[in-house]
Curated annotation (Swiss-Prot):
The gene is TOC33. Disruption phenotype: Plants exhibits a pale yellowish phenotype. This is Translocase of chloroplast 33, chloroplastic. Changing D219N: Normal GTPase activity. One of its GO terms (cellular component) is chloroplast envelope. PANTHER family: GTPASE, IMAP FAMILY MEMBER-RELATED, TRANSLOCASE OF CHLOROPLAST 33, CHLOROPLASTIC.
């Protein structure tokens, strides 16, 4: 299930200012002996995963339609430029009919076997007003699938970022509240300790994939705060890829579902031993009761 590596034609579609920044970021990766990088994109359906992939590549590499369901299988897009290769893996939505789609996660795991994930983009929408239990269940499912270490290689990407919040809230206040609520959900669902989660330092980046996205004076797609979001996202991706945490290698053990069960398996001998001792103690107590009850008063 390999992907054909093609020359990065879409790179030329970016404004000159964006091209310069991307060349700088990828050059820093090559200086650290990273000649390739693999980015996994996960999230619920309809949050803008595929559109974000298209924006990052600068080409319509993944079909996006508001009137069609998302693809049912993962797709890897690979582009090379100047000796550097970027692989981005688009995936099906992780929710189906209001529940976590575990079948989709199994398909994703199978697709990823023997691959190494340098960065996870966990995608959601900025223009949503609340976080619910389903969001937590999605995080739990991702954690059970890849281990909580995956969150140490994660960026939270909030799409539809050219959003006008309610009149009483500034853009900065709303985006901060929205990102904070999602980060709290990730911490709760991943079951990471407070210090452990703070050390993981999940960064939040914003994206606007619409063709109506505003542009700055350098012709770059810009958010309401003036930020050129594509180079900002790529910089954040390269920062995570080089953050000293181990990349996530998906091996057969993880695919077979034994990853999250290892600790439980190690405890089985201890549990059996404890059960044996308890049974022996109960049997001894019963024998003593029988002996005691058999004595004359």
């Amino acid at each position: 299930m390999g992907s054909l590596v093609r020359e990065w034609v879409g790179f030329q579609q970016f404004p000159a200012a964006t091209q310069e920044k991307l060349i700088e970021f990828f050059g820093k990766l090559k200086q650290k002996d990273m000649n390739s990088m693999t980015v996994l994109v996960l999230g619920k359906g309809g949050v803008g995963k595929s559109s974000t992939v298209n924006s990052l590549i600068g080409e319509q590499v993944v079909r996006v339609s508001p009137f069609q369901a998302e693809g049912l299988r993962p797709v890897m897009v690979s582009r090379t430029m100047g000796g550097f290769t970027i692989n981005i893996i688009d995936t099906p939505g992780l929710v189906e009919a209001g529940y976590v789609n575990h079948q989709a996660l199994e398909l994703i795991k199978g697709f990823l076997v023997n691959r190494t994930i340098d960065v996870l983009l966990y995608v959601d929408r900025l223009d949503v007003y609340r976080v619910d239990e389903l969001d937590k269940q999605v995080v739990i499912a991702i954690t059970q699938t890849f281990g909580k270490e995956i969150w140490c290689k994660t960026l939270l990407v909030l799409t539809h970022a050219q959003f006008s919040p309610p009149d009483e809230l500034s853009y900065e206040t709303f985006s901060s509240k929205r990102s904070d609520s999602l980060l709290k959900t990730i911490r709760a669902g991943s079951k990471m300790r407070k210090q452990e989660f703070e050390d993981s330092a999940i960064a939040v980046v914003y994206a606007e994939n619409s063709g109506r996205c505003s542009k700055n004076d350098k012709d770059e797609k810009a958010l309401p705060n003036g930020e050129a979001w594509i180079p900002n996202l790529v910089k954040a991706i390269t920062d995570v890829a080089t953050n000293q945490r181990k990349a996530i290698h998906v091996d057969k053990k993880m695919v077979d579902g034994s990853y999250s069960d290892d600790k439980g398996k190690k405890l089985i001998p201890l549990i059996i031993g404890a059960q044996y001792l308890i049974v022996k103690m109960i049997q001894g107590a019963i024998r003593n009761d029988i002996k005691t009850s058999g004595k004359p008063l």
